Design a protein with these regions (language model features):
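Short, aromatic-rich membrane-interface segments at the entry and exit
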Residues: 56-61
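Hydrophobic transmembrane alpha-helical segments in integral membrane proteins
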Residues: 1-14
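A generic, lipid-embedded transmembrane alpha helix
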Residues: 38-53
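N-terminal signal-anchor/start-transfer transmembrane helix
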Residues: 12-24
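Membrane-proximal helix-loop-helix units in multi-pass membrane proteins
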Residues: 82-138
Length: 143
């Protein structure tokens, strides 16, 4: 149960990263409060999908891509093609940062790459470090 709450926290962090990325790079269609609410609501749906699919990586990747495309289309002035392109960039950065941190922990601690599924301490460490790295990567894509 505690791990579910941490995953919810991670999804909220990802919602804010998507909000920052799209609103920093495109003209806003929604006021900040509504835009943040839309992002959090969409990512909450992603969190529910994550619970239902038992953290299936491929389903989660597809869900996040769809969430980011929908969020971009409703919150900023962007074409569908650009929304898909930029959502794919966000997805790739998120996936790469998570995989990078999981690989480092797997190598250094001599644990399975998906040890976060069964070890709450590893989940917290990998989750926080990968999201900080994700935020940094997203922030530096458009200096």
């Amino acid at each position: 149960m505690v791990s579910h709450l941490f995953f919810l926290f991670i999804y909220i962090v990802e919602a804010f990263i998507a909000y920052m990325y799209f609103t920093d790079n495109y003209e806003k269609k929604l006021k900040a409060g509504f835009s943040i609410l839309a992002s959090c609501a969409l990512y909450f749906i992603g969190f529910i999908v994550n619970l239902v699919d038992n953290n299936n990586v491929l389903i989660n990747l597809a869900t996040i891509l769809i969430i980011n495309v929908v969020y971009a289309l409703i919150s900023v002035d962007i074409t569908f093609k650009s929304a898909v392109f930029h959502s794919s960039i966000l997805l790739a950065l998120m996936f790469l940062t998570e995989t990078f941190i999981q690989s480092i922990f797997s190598f250094t601690l001599k644990v399975q790459i998906d040890a976060y599924r069964n070890d709450f301490t590893i989940l917290i460490i990998v989750g926080i470090i990968s999201k900080v790295l994700y935020l940094m990567a997203v922030s530096y894509t458009h200096l």
